[in-house]
């Protein structure tokens, strides 16, 4: 896997799985399959309405969370503050942190 190193030293996998508009079982299986073949960068958003499925795919893959780079995004009018949006996404994904928001 190739990485891009950001100015702060964070390494971001160049190849990522975008999870836009996946349905429940399709989303879970796509995430699990991607991780199985070596993807380590998962990109989702609350706006996609599938963070629960993406999180389930991550958990069911069995991979250690620390080995993944998880990205989520905020829709400008979805939440009162970015902090509330981040907390909501972490709860939906059932993870303790998001690598990039």
Language model feature labels by segment:
Residues 65-78, 97-101:
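A short, structured active-site edge motif that brings together acidic residues
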Residues 1-68, 83-84, 96:
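N-terminal binding-site loop/beta-alpha segment at the start of enzyme catalytic domains
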Residues 80-101:
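Glycine/proline-rich, positively charged
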């Amino acid at each position: 896997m190739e990485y891009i190193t950001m100015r702060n030293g964070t390494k971001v996998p160049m190849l990522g799985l975008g999870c836009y508009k996946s349905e429940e079982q399709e989303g879970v299986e796509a995430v699990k399959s991607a991780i199985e073949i070596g993807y380590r960068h998962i990109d989702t958003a609350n706006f996609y309405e599938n963070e629960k499925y993406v999180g389930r795919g991550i958990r069911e893959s069995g991979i250690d969370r620390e080995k993944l780079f998880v990205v989520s995004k905020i829709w400008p009018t979805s939440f009162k503050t970015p902090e509330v949006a981040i907390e909501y996404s972490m709860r939906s994904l059932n993870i303790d942190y998001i690598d990039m928001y």
